[in-house]
């Protein structure tokens, strides 16, 4: 969260001049969604609960949509924002399904409690663990623009340059990696999922 804050302060400082020639309403729109994104990213990184993580995850996608389409008179920018929005929503659906499955299995969405229950019950190879974690990884693939969802990221650069630097290079596209890190103590025990993640990471690279 500290790293997000430092990068965000740099972008905000640069943005002050970058959008200074815009109308007051457009300037307000830009700063509002930029501030909302930064707040959501910080809260996402601090969250120890999958439900709140999902909520902030959704705010990240929403802010990305509006900021990519900031130049809304540009048809290509509008199209790019729509493509990014729906592709990431597809991944969010898998994330939501994973939350339902995890909630039924563990009776909680607190990450520490889930990790503790996982080891106490010695169910590392259980399919009921592998499936929801795979669904979360699919959500990460879309948000992080990994193969086969890389199509939206180059298009997202139609938004303002500071937004491309903050959201689509430094923060949102690594939010999924941070989510996997939070659940890493479980994922590292799921051999099939580890291989799945390694394949997509290597192929995208």
Give the positions of each predicted feature.
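...captures the hydrophobic TM-helix bundle architecture rather than a specific catalytic motif
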Residues: 1-205
């Amino acid at each position: 969260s500290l790293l997000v804050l430092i990068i965000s302060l740099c972008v905000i400082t640069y943005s002050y001049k970058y959008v200074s020639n815009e109308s007051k309403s457009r300037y307000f729109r830009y700063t509002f969604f930029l501030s909302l994104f930064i707040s959501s990213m910080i809260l996402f990184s601090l969250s120890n609960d999958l439900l709140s993580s999902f909520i902030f995850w959704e705010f990240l996608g929403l802010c990305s949509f509006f900021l990519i389409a900031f130049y809304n008179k540009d048809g290509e920018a509008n199209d790019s924002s729509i493509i990014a929005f729906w592709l990431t929503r597809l991944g969010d659906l898998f994330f939501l399904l994973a939350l339902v499955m995890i909630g039924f299995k563990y009776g909680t969405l607190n990450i520490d409690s889930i990790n503790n229950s996982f080891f106490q019950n010695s169910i590392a190879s259980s399919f009921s663990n592998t499936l929801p974690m795979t669904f979360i990884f699919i959500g990460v693939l879309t948000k992080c623009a990994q193969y086969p969802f890389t199509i939206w990221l180059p298009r997202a650069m139609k938004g303002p340059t500071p937004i491309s630097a903050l959201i689509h290079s430094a923060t949102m596209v690594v939010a999924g990696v941070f989510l996997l890190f939070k659940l890493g103590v479980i994922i590292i025990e799921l051999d099939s999922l580890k291989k799945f993640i390694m394949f997509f990471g290597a192929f995208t690279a």
